[in-house]
Amino acid sequence: MAATDAALRQAQGDTGLRRKYEAVIGIECHVELKTTSKMFCGCPNEFGGEPNTKVCPVCLALPGALPVPNAKAIELMIAAGLAFDAEIPAFSKFDRKNYFYPDMPKDYQISQFDMPLTQGGVVHYWLPDGTKKSCRLTRIHLEEDTGKSTHAGSGDGRIAGSSYSLVDFNRAGVPLMECVGEPDIRSADEAVGYLEALKRTFVELGVSDVKMEEGSLRCDANVSVRLFGAPEYGTKAEIKNMNSFRSVHDAIESEIDRQIAVIEGGGRVIQETRGWDEAAGVTHSMRSKEQAHDYRYFPEPDLVPLELDRAVVERIRAAMPPVPFERFERYTEKFGISVKQTTQLVDNPALAGYFDRVVTITNAPVATLNFVLGDLSRLANESGTAVIAGKVTPEALAELIALTEAKTINSKIAKDVLARLWADGGSAKSIVEGEGLAQVSDPGAIAKFVDDVLAANAESVTQFKAGKENVLKFLVGQVMKTSRGKANPELVEALLREQIAAR
Amino acid sequence: MATERIDVRGVARLARLALSDEEIERYGAQLEDLLKHVDDLKQLDTSDVAATAQVIESRNVMRPDVLVPCLDHDVVMAGAPQPQHGFFRVPKIIAEVG
Amino acid sequence: MDPVRASAREIARAVNAREVSAVEIAETMIPHVAAVDEHLGAYLTLTPDLMREHARRVDARIAAGESLPLAGVPAAIKDNMCLLGTRTTCASKILEHWIAPYTGTAVERLLAAGALPIGKTNMDEFAMGSSGENSALGKTKNPYDLDRVPGGSSAGSAAAVGGFAATISTGSDTGGSIREPAAFCNVVGFKPTYGRVSRYGLIAFASSLDQIGPFARTVEDAALTYDAMGGHDPMDATSVDMPFETTAGHLREDLRGVRVGIVKEFATSDLAPDVAAAYEAAYADLQKLGAELVEVELPTAKYGLSTYYLIAPAECSSNLARFDGVRYGLRVDGADVGEMYEKTRAAGFGPEVKRRILIGTYALSSGYYDAYYVKAQKARTRIADDFRRAFATCDVIASPAASSPAFAFNAKSDPYSMYLMDYYTIPVSLAGLPSLSIPCGSALPEGGSRPMPLGLQLASPLFSERALLGYAHAYERATQHAIKLTPDPHCHPELVEGPR
């Protein structure tokens, strides 16, 4: 029985109900692999273009054509599996999944049924507040993408109500990873965290662009609810048609509310497929009657099995960069960096790699972070170049940071030197020594500057003594000016206070 | 094995073949006849053999990830039963053509 | 040299030696074939312009100093093989007007070796059949008796060569579709080991069984043709990446030291008396050539038909799904795409094709997959094992290619009786072994008035093509059965165009 509007509204506003019911969510993703050519032929694996211009006898399924698997796709799959600690079996094969659909050129899809390229695995991820979570993977397998249908004649591009469809096979045959997650996820936020972890990892590995808006990541969510403490899972509904992480979040939230409302209203959740309607903010049932597919899986006779040599797997593992979660843990727990800044870094793997190299030398993660995310990124943004494409090598930055940490130069000078390094490259040490930019920390010298400034600013001294604290800033600034920026600002401040007190 | 009646209509639907009632009867009878013959496989002991996947022993046959020229668009569309604006047009898809 | 009667070897030698041009060969064959085919019906499409174009190219290459193994040899191509720009129909209404936009590898290699494409030959629809009668687009007759079937599924390719309307031709063999029509049409028909010849461009029937192979009037010609077509192809993942052993020029001339296995379960006593006698004589001839006859057992061969008629239909039900009216071929419109599929396929496929799609879909369907498809694949392993054991005691197995000579049209209306025509060839196919049929005499068929050809099937271990063709060559050299029979007057080379 469908939830009444009132019940739904009540559920949506009622956090008490959310405490009563536990949501159980399993995510299934299809991720297009970033190869040059398609999975079984040499046509380009590229988004966009005029329809039916990137096809050949194989991906168009002309009579007589035969598939040959893309070695790179297999390698990327293995890397993806290893990134999540999945098991890479010794033996794998392809199977045919038989069903008819206009965007399926062969009317079967070459996929993997009982011997996928990876088994198991765990996706570790984090929530915005830094809580660590994990979701087990059932498997990741390799298959080929379908063509794309556009539905015409209904006015809104949806299938229902359309009078005909137009099919483009440019996408047919693009290699696809199907990632099936266990139902370990318990909230919409977790679902998004999980997806972000997948995305970050795949982008870092170069396995996929993972752009939902371009279709290189598509996902469905299986959602069910049960009373907290109940031993059995509730009936699940499969949610489709979510086009962004935001949609995934909202759709899951909406579906949880709907299911709770149904149950609270005395009804039962039906196992069905439901489509997310972004505009209306609800899910709609997509099937009038449940029809089980008989895919008639059988081993693909046009392909031979894969025997995955352990040495090859190890070679792939050795060449992989660290996974984002590893970075997350290291940055937040070992380095004490905030979740927000960690996320910022992790989302930019190139920058994170740069950061890691600098920290290896400086052993000063916080200071390094401040430079990297602060002034260095600012310089990079202003010039429209990425940090790693710029002239400041990790070694040069590390040198600059070392000079700052040793208090050889002050922060203002450091800023200037950084700007010089960004513009011309080179070494911080050379610049500082060459131009005598070293911070003046000799108390005697500073005392002289302080004397001069106090002498010239008697009213300020009076104002400070009268309680105006911020006058000190002005005075520090004056001393810095007099010393051409080289005085050690902390010493300056300390001496100023001392001297004023003595006057 | 083949003792119950075959659901020829169901099989025909899976195979996307429109069959008349007469054809359902006729093919049904012929299929059942074949299955009676095929029943002799029950007598063959296959408990200790693996299914043949391929008669050849090849493994790991793959291709490098390089581009190969595509078919010319005009050639592709020349064979299309109903080309439209460079697409293949098909009648409306009823949501679950599963 | 008379191009109609000459062997491929003779034609190639003469063209390479510039004694005759490929264009002259083409210009002789084109009218000849057109005239013969009025009666024979071997071809669905004749390609005279293409033949001339290839002839010109061959002559140019010869003039530039090249030597081509099949220079100027007139070749017929079975119509389930894609040849760029030609109608490629599989003898089905569903592809009746389809023009192939590419050429398959084996055909490409054949033409690159200098062969001239005469046209595309008739066949049983989608290679499903053993008589040629399942063609939806034409009727091919046996060149030795126009009232009898040529065999199938490579009906036209066998008939063309047997009827002197081609020097060589390509066929495909899944359960016997080269060997059986070769036997019926008095020619050599050779199926290589599975994986030896690329399947890229061969419209698939049963992927794990299909192989392309040659028809010719001599073993040597068959060897030359196979050598041109065979070898690894990166476009076919099932083509074997092994050094290719050429066969022509390495053919032995006797059978001394060769152990020929005679299969206990294929007793000639199962056959009609004069057919049995012919085979017994053939076995005796093998002995006269120095072979030792050895009895071998293939206890599971009797399960071959059941095994085959589960595996092949299962694979074909999937392979033929792509014929859906969306991208090419016949389309019959419907109110929605589902109706379009059903009506298109109902109109486009003939009865035998529908039968096999139905049985194949059933064998793969949920609840039946293990009992049928998996069981059959296990039975296949047992059959292959039997052959392996047999080859421990013999080098080659000899048997009838078919249980009778060519039968009359409409003689086998019951599907299963037709399936029985492949009884001897199917087990060999299931094991993937190289195998051929070579003319071994004749017998009067039931109700017939003239003797019809018989074929001896030889099968040898995997990848032993050179040895196999050698055994056949030795047998042919000593017995020369093919030339003892005269084709129908409409096909006899002497009588068609007069002296040359």
Residue spans for each PLM region:
Chain C
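An N-terminal boundary/leader segment
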Residues: 1-52, 288-289, 362, 484-492, ...
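Serine-dependent amide/ester hydrolase catalytic core
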Residues: 12-13, 300-304, 322-430, 486
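Acyltransferase
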Residues: 22-27, 56-59, 247, 271-297, ...
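Residue-level signal for inorganic ion chemistry
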Residues: 29, 51, 103, 222, ...
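Structural helix-boundary/capping segments
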Residues: 35, 108, 163-169, 174-272, ...
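Long amphipathic alpha-helix in the N-terminal Rossmann-like dinucleotide-binding domain
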Residues: 49-56, 114-115, 124
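Immediate post-signal peptide segment of exported/extracytoplasmic ligand-binding proteins
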Residues: 58-74, 221, 251-261
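Short glycine/serine-rich loop/turn segments
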Residues: 70-212, 265, 313-314, 399-416
